[in-house]
């Protein structure tokens, strides 16, 4: 059995040849390659988002499209034939226009870009392979995983599932600053490999909210129901703004110090489904290109922390990624034989938004101050369900996406098809994806 484990946004402290790799990739990867990857990542993000929302329409949603894409792209290094085609096309790549090697070089470029030092935003991202100690992994796969995806390799004794589980979870916890503590559970003795991709993000608002201004206020779940939340407030803020009359929503961008920003999309009352149905890469480009600096007299945003847990092996087949979960899976580029298939893809994410900024992690297994004229008076209150997209402004990649339907919600749902468990956390954003591989 082989497994791919959840990815957490974060970067290993040691990566061989990183500076050399950055120079080589910058020389060999064109801007077209990276733009293609960014567009495909956005397309995949919105497609997955619609599936998650369809299964749980009234729940909070938070996930890292980049983490999930990276885990699956890394897995595709070991895939052949139709299994390979399904994975890459499921990630929204046009294989006629973008050859497979260009896709992997694009990920290499973005991962190197995200891990460059000196940024005021803390972004850590990386991958790890946990391999059954008796399993022979092809040297070519291991080297490509290291060179293209910065993947570290470790041996594990899956004949002792509890010990192997602790090894993997400790690794993820350490690389997500303790935000993702239990990425995987229930490993079986038949597990042969677990692939983990992680990402960790921590950013400070360029214009932080004053905690002394935070107050209790109503958040309207719908036209009839509301809850009391901690509402942050700021005033006389000059920030990118766009009013989309066509989709009946307001778009505001709040910047972090460094190369990151958060885009907030606030649909008019009753217009959330209309906005969700229109989510396409072209829509995001339109919003970004239409944002203009605007003085906002008062902006209110709830302080919140949400956590989700998804079993993606039930959702990815709906996006065309099917064969890798079946006995027809061809992952022979990993071991040289067709003896592996993916049994589980778990994605865990934690998102916290507070006065000073945002902290996030994920794992996949598999204010300008000024004066405002009376006629320019503008108030924006995020006191009803809204969307949030966190992006790296240098790589132009969407790192996290969230839908906040209830900032105060704390629920547990049974793990199942499309199920998620949500709990309140504080000051963090983490993502993790594990892919579990088993023998056939």
Swiss-Prot record:
Free-text tissue specificity from the UniProt record: Expressed in bone marrow (particularly hematopoietic stem cells), heart, kidney, liver, lung, skeletal muscle, spleen, testis, thymus and T-cells.
InterPro entries tied to this protein: Serpin_CS, Serpin_dom, Serpin_fam, Serpin_sf, Serpin_sf_1, Serpin_sf_2
A GO term, aspect molecular function: serine-type endopeptidase inhibitor activity
Subcellular location: Cytoplasm; Nucleus
SMART domains referenced in this protein's UniProt entry, alphabetically: SERPIN
Gene3D superfamilies, per database record: Alpha-1-antitrypsin, domain 1, Antithrombin, subunit I, domain 2
Pfam families: Serpin
Nucleus as UniProt keyword: yes
Induction context: Induction during apoptosis requires NF-kappa-B, a heterodimer of RELA- and NFKB1.
BP terms from Gene Ontology: adaptive immune response; apoptotic process; response to cytokine; response to peptide hormone
Origin superkingdom: Eukaryota
Region (RCL): 357-382
Site positions per UniProt: Reactive bond: 371-372
Tagged with keyword Lyase: no
Main localization (coarse): cytoplasm
Swiss-Prot/TrEMBL keywords: Adaptive immunity, Apoptosis, Cytoplasm, Immunity, Nucleus, Protease inhibitor, Serine protease inhibitor, Thiol protease inhibitor
A Gene Ontology cellular-component term: extracellular space
Family per similarity comment: Belongs to the serpin family.
Function: Serine and cysteine protease inhibitor. Can inhibit lysosomal papain-like proteases including the cathepsins B, G, H, K, L and V. Ineffective against elastase, granzyme A, granzyme B, or caspases 3, 8 or 9. Inhibition of cytoplasmic cathepsin B following release from the lysosome may protect cells from apoptosis. This may facilitate the survival of progenitor T-cells and the subsequent development of long term memory CD8 T-cells.
Additional observations: The single human alpha1-antichymotrypsin gene (SERPINA3) is represented by a cluster of 14 individual murine paralogs.
Written domain comment of the UniProt record: The reactive center loop (RCL) extends out from the body of the protein and directs binding to the target protease. The protease cleaves the serpin at the reactive site within the RCL, establishing a covalent linkage between the serpin reactive site and the protease. The resulting inactive serpin-protease complex is highly stable. Variability within the reactive center loop (RCL) sequences of Serpina3 paralogs may determine target protease specificity.
Protein name (Swiss-Prot/TrEMBL): Serine protease inhibitor A3G
Lineage per the UniProt record: Eukaryota, Metazoa, Chordata, Craniata, Vertebrata
């Amino acid at each position: 059995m082989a497994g791919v484990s959840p990815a957490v946004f974060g970067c290993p402290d040691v990566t061989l040849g990183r500076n050399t790799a950055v120079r080589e990739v910058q020389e060999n990867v064109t801007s077209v390659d990276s733009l293609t990857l960014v567009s495909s990542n956005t397309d995949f993000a919105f497609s997955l988002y619609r599936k998650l929302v369809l299964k749980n329409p009234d729940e909070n949603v938070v996930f890292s499209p980049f983490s999930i894409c990276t885990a699956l792209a890394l897995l595709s290094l070991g895939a052949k034939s139709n299994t390979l085609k399904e994975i890459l096309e499921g990630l929204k790549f046009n294989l006629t226009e973008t050859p497979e090697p260009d896709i992997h070089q694009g990920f290499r470029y973005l991962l190197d870009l995200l891990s460059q030092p000196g940024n005021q935003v803390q972004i850590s991202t990386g991958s790890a392979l946990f391999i059954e100690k008796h399993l022979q992994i092809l040297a070519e796969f291991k080297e490509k995983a290291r060179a293209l995806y910065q993947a570290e390799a470790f041996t594990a004794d899956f004949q002792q599932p509890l010990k192997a589980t602790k090894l993997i979870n400790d690794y993820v916890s350490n690389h997500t600053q303790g935000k993702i503590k239990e990425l995987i559970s229930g490993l079986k003795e038949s597990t042969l490999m677990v692939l983990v991709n992680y990402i960790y993000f921590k950013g400070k608002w360029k214009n932080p909210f004053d905690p002394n201004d935070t107050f209790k206020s109503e958040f309207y779940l719908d036209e009839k129901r509301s809850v009391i939340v901690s509402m942050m407030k700021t005033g006389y803020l000059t920030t990118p703004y766009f009013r989309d009359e066509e989709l009946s929503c307001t778009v505001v961008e709040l910047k972090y110090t460094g190369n990151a920003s958060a885009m907030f999309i606030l649909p008019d009352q009753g217009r959330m489904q209309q906005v969700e149905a229109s989510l396409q890469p072209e829509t995001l480009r339109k919003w970004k290109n239409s944002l203009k600096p605007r003085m906002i007299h008062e902006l209110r945003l709830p302080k919140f922390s949400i956590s989700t847990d998804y079993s993606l092996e039930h959702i990815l087949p709906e996006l065309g990624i099917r064969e890798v979960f079946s006995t027809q899976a061809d992952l022979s580029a990993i071991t040289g034989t067709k003896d592996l298939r993916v049994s589980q893809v778990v994605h865990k994410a934690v998102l916290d938004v507070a006065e000073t900024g945002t902290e996030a992690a994920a794992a996949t297994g598999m204010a300008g101050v000024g004066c405002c004229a009376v006629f320019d008076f503008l108030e924006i209150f995020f006191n009803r369900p809204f969307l949030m997209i966190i992006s790296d402004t240098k790589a132009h990649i969407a790192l996290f996406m969230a839908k906040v339907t209830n900032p105060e919600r704390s629920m547990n749902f049974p793990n199942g098809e499309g199920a998620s468990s949500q709990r309140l956390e504080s000051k963090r954003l983490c993502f993790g994806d594990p892919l579990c591989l088993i023998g056939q």
